[in-house]
Structures are given as structure tokens and as C-alpha cells.
């Protein structure tokens, strides 16, 4: 069943790649909208960017694990 293993690994790779592309697209979309920031909103913007990065990393880790989402 080596062909099945390769197909499964390749499918997981493609899913991970699509997820990373999607997250990158989301981050680029959000960054373009927040281009006009005020000085008092800089800290909030930086925290939001950090949280978005962390959420993206957690999401990709979850996708790679192949585990069902826990509710």
C-alpha cells in the first residue's frame, strides 16, 4: 500500500499548503485594511497582528496534526 501512503502524505501536504496560502491571504488582506493607523491605535494594532499570527500558527499546527477539532 505504498501508493496509498504516498497519496495520503501528498494530500496532507496539499491541504497544509492551501491552509498556509489561505492564512497568508487573510493576513495580507487585514494588513492592507489597517494601513491607516493612528498613533494611539499602534499598540492595539501590534497586539492584534501578534494574535492573528499566533492564531494562524495554531491553525496550521492543527491542520498538520489531522486531529478533529475539539469543541
Curated annotation (Swiss-Prot):
Q: What is its main location?
A: secreted
Asked if the Swiss-Prot or TrEMBL record annotates the protein with the keyword Secreted, the reply is: yes
One GO CC term, this protein: extracellular region
Induction record: Produced in the A cells of the islets of Langerhans in response to a drop in blood sugar concentration.
Fill in the misc note: X's in the sequence were included by homology with other fish sequences.
Superkingdom of the organism of origin: Eukaryota
Q: What is this protein called?
A: Pro-glucagon
A GO BP entry: response to starvation
Any one Pfam family here would be Hormone_2
Q: Which UniProt keywords apply?
A: Hormone, Secreted
Where does the protein end up?
Secreted
Q: Does the keyword Secreted apply?
A: yes
* Record family assignment: Belongs to the glucagon family.
GO molecular function terms here? glucagon receptor binding; hormone activity
Amino acid at each position: 500500500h505504498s501508493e496509498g501512503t504516498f497519496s495520503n502524505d501528498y494530500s496532507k501536504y496539499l491541504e497544509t499548503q492551501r491552509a498556509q496560502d489561505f492564512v497568508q491571504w487573510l493576513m495580507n488582506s487585514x494588513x492592507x485594511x489597517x494601513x491607516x493607523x493612528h498613533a494611539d491605535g499602534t499598540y492595539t494594532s501590534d497586539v492584534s497582528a501578534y494574535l492573528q499570527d499566533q492564531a494562524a500558527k495554531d491553525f496550521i499546527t492543527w491542520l498538520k496534526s489531522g486531529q478533529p477539532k475539539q469543541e
